[in-house]
């Protein structure tokens, strides 16, 4: 199948799903504050919640260039799989965390693991697509990010209602 004309698009489709998950789980926290604050009272403070949101963004932003270097030196397929595994485990652990410090640490870890995905994913797409299809492939992949943002906010709103 790797030599077929459809395989590069299968890669985009698989990475689209990973991109969706990458953005969906990061978005959910912002709409689940009230539900989480019931169990973790420190989250009732806007400053503490801001720190929780900020630690992810700062670490994600600082890690992105490093993630690019790591992606250039490692097998990108396995880097993506490992990143997906770690951030999925972190998402689960955040659901059972009991303290603000646990959630803060997990949010920082999520920033590291999610930062590893985008450089590796885009590079992998570039490996499979020539100049004729590369921009379209990346554009399709990017819709996974935006769909994940939308579903993450919507899904968390529904979860918060129950």
Set out the residue ranges of the language-model regions.
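Extracellular/periplasmic helix-loop-helix junction of adjacent transmembrane segments
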Residues: 32-62
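Glycine-rich segments within core transmembrane alpha-helices of 12-TM secondary carriers
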Residues: 135-156, 160
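Interfacial helix-cap and linker-helix signal at transmembrane-aqueous boundaries
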Residues: 36-37, 70-71, 155-162
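Cytoplasmic helix-loop-helix junction between adjacent transmembrane helices
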Residues: 106-144
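Extracytoplasmic
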Residues: 10-44
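Helix-breaking motifs and short loop linkers at transmembrane-helix boundaries and internal kinks
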Residues: 41, 75, 96-102, 129-130
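Conserved MFS/SLC helix-loop-helix module at the cytosolic interface between two early adjacent transmembrane helices
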Residues: 62-98
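Residue-level signature of mid-helix packing/kink "hotspots" within the transmembrane helices
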Residues: 27, 57-65, 115, 149-150
């Amino acid at each position: 199948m790797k030599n077929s004309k459809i395989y590069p698009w299968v890669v985009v489709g698989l990475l689209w799903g990973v991109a969706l998950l990458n953005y969906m789980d990061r978005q959910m926290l912002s709409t689940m504050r009230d539900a989480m604050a019931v169990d973790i009272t420190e989250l009732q403070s806007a400053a503490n919640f801001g720190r929780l949101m900020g630690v992810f963004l700062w670490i994600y932003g600082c890690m992105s260039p490093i993630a690019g270097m790591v992606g250039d030196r490692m097998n990108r397929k396995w880097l993506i799989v490992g990143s997906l595994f770690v951030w999925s485990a972190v998402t689960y652990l955040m659901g059972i965390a009991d303290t603000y410090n646990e959630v803060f640490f997990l949010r920082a870890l999520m920033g590291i693991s999610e930062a590893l995905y985008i450089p590796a994913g885009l590079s992998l797409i570039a490996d499979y697509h020539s100049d004729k299809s590369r921009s379209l492939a990346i554009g399709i992949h990017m819709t996974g990010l935006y769909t994940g943002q939308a579903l993450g906010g919507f899904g968390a709103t529904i979860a918060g209602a129950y």
